[in-house]
Amino acid sequence: MSSSSWLLLSLVAVTAAQSTIEEQAKTFLDKFNHEAEDLFYQSSLASWNYNTNITEENVQNMNNAGDKWSAFLKEQSTLAQMYPLQEIQNLTVKLQLQALQQNGSSVLSEDKSKRLNTILNTMSTIYSTGKVCNPDNPQECLLLEPGLNEIMANSLDYNERLWAWESWRSEVGKQLRPLYEEYVVLKNEMARANHYEDYGDYWRGDYEVNGVDGYDYSRGQLIEDVEHTFEEIKPLYEHLHAYVRAKLMNAYPSYISPIGCLPAHLLGDMWGRFWTNLYSLTVPFGQKPNIDVTDAMVDQAWDAQRIFKEAEKFFVSVGLPNMTQGFWENSMLTDPGNVQKAVCHPTAWDLGKGDFRILMCTKVTMDDFLTAHHEMGHIQYDMAYAAQPFLLRNGANEGFHEAVGEIMSLSAATPKHLKSIGLLSPDFQEDNETEINFLLKQALTIVGTLPFTYMLEKWRWMVFKGEIPKDQWMKKWWEMKREIVGVVEPVPHDETYCDPASLFHVSNDYSFIRYYTRTLYQFQFQEALCQAAKHEGPLHKCDISNSTEAGQKLFNMLRLGKSEPWTLALENVVGAKNMNVRPLLNYFEPLFTWLKDQNKNSFVGWSTDWSPYADQSIKVRISLKSALGDKAYEWNDNEMYLFRSSVAYAMRQYFLKVKNQMILFGEEDVRVANLKPRISFNFFVTAPKNVSDIIPRTEVEKAIRMSRSRINDAFRLNDNSLEFLGIQPTLGPPNQPPVSIWLIVFGVVMGVIVVGIVILIFTGIRDRKKKNKARSGENPYASIDISKGENNPGFQNTDDVQTSF
């Protein structure tokens, strides 16, 4: 047989083998899809029941259903390894196998997998059921929703906001801290077993595209794109920050620095994530009609059902389908109140088998009106790709899913659209001032959140990578918050806190960079859809409602799900493969120009040195080595506890003996900040159970002086080695010199004067003697002719001469 014949037979054999493997893979995937539908639905339904009714029974049911689903996935993932990806030509088959060959959490041992599930469920429960109680009335307690969120949305009382902000983190964040530490370890172990560097790298894998010529995208490229787009956004954010700071100075005049960061508890919600609720404080032209239509919604008796029906009308107007009957029957759109505990954070659910639902404790506000559009956008995406195989029913990437609803919110928020649905008066006139009002309101929500999102995810990526030691989590968190976001903690937090986990997405294991990428995508999509809708004019005035052309362009992307690379899906809509910040900057260009003019006499940017508690803080320096030499002990958390307890003791003694008040200060009331390894730190004291009541520095100084010897003795130190800066003297009694200082100074001055006089007299006498000696050889007055009446000064009458020095 000729060599060419052998080659032909070999090619046929290889092709046949590939065909056989590919056909086997298809059969395997068909079986998987059928079985997965049922098990996933049961697991999702159990999770829904728990999230809408938090009980021990529902927790157990959810865990059991989740264990079954995890065991099934682990088994199927092992079977999927039998099909080498390099031998699969069909892209749809290959993508499904790629997804299934990722083991996820099932790669962990059974014990660790169960422990991870327990941690996740416990963190979710703590977050959803956490309460903050009034210290003066322990029976009066508030959940996050609606109680604490209501305070953070509407209160203008600095101290009330601080109480809510701090209490939530103290109550919930501290409980979550040990769980979150375990979570990081287990998630990293899972990620590395799946061939990722760490869990942050695993999350970034959602954006990775391989093997598609011209459309590849790496995990590292995501980091680069996020960082360089953030640099482009910063100038706009810095001017928004400066403008908001000036307005907050008007509202809280003694609490804001004109060049400093913004206190974290004053920014509109519990986390400072969205600044939307600052609009009433910052509106540029308050005499214009209010474009926040909350009052109009209340006046017109809108309710949750009406809000979601209006959102549905919007989607239908662009040619997308109605919600299903099951959606309206099974969704939970209002807070169940005291009937049952529920997770109130808005979420969209695709349970499988065509069962789509939304969970949201809707309030009648413009903010929730726009949130309803966002959540229904998720459902539209879910319904559009429902025909895809089970493993490809997802967004092209996580940012795409978040962007879809936001596109609709951009249109729904425009004055044009609000007029069309009767929430703005028909005679509402748009002009330059209403345009700036509108754009500022949009910027408070959209631009204000971008640094928050970027910084939070950057911190988590660094934690997962091991770049931030566990004993420095909070220190680095607030350093990054100051540097990147321009936001400062209103009170210092030590390493017992876990402030990031006080946010739903962190405690519930959501990647967060999706909210950054979605913001860029949404403006790219909006620009493309507005072109399809034949919009003319500025991008911020575009309303795509009633444009079926725009709707069709969007639907063509939605129905692909994850069956095509996201870079290709993006190109199909916007004509470019990568995220681009330019459409967002174009949208806000009129506002940016206006802000630069407003800020021309203000400091733009922020100093990271200022803090709200700095004025009442005392700096401490401790020198163990110089005082104790080789016997010096190690300064650690226990020593800090002793220091704080000692100060608390001093405060109790002072208030009891000087003010006749029994106030039970505890070590938790002594707040420490800026701790340095060479043992220096700042501290201040707050009233027990009231973090907003800072004890004046002068009172703390007096308390320290009163108990100076007890504090010294506790640390085996003295006034020189345990130094309270700014308290002069620090722990010792006032130093009284034996002679008054003014008398010493007077004596020195007089001594200098006397010495000067003596020197002057001596030099004068010496000079006179020299002159007399020089004149002794001749009569200096020989030329005087007395007969002519000339006066001889050598013979003047002494009675007519004034003597002087």
Curated annotation (Swiss-Prot):
Please spell out the taxonomic lineage of the organism that makes this protein.
Eukaryota, Metazoa, Chordata, Craniata, Vertebrata
Q: Which cofactor does it need?
A: Zn(2+); chloride
- What does the UniProt entry list as the effect of changing H239Q? No effect on interaction with SARS-CoV spike glycoprotein
Mutagenesis or variant effect for T27Y:
Increases slightly the interaction with RBD domain of SARS-CoV-2 spike protein. In sACE2.v2.2; increases interaction with RBD domain of SARS-CoV-2 spike protein
The organism encoding this protein is Homo sapiens
Q: What is the effect of changing L91P?
A: Increases slightly the interaction with RBD domain of SARS-CoV-2 spike protein
Covalent cross-link site, Glycyl lysine isopeptide (Lys-Gly) (interchain with G-Cter in ubiquitin): K788
User: This protein is called what?
Assistant: Angiotensin-converting enzyme 2
The record's region (Disordered) falls at: 772-805
EC assignment: the record states: 3.4.17.23, 3.4.17.-
The segments annotated as topological domain Extracellular are 18-740
Residues modified as Phosphotyrosine are Y781
Its gene is ACE2
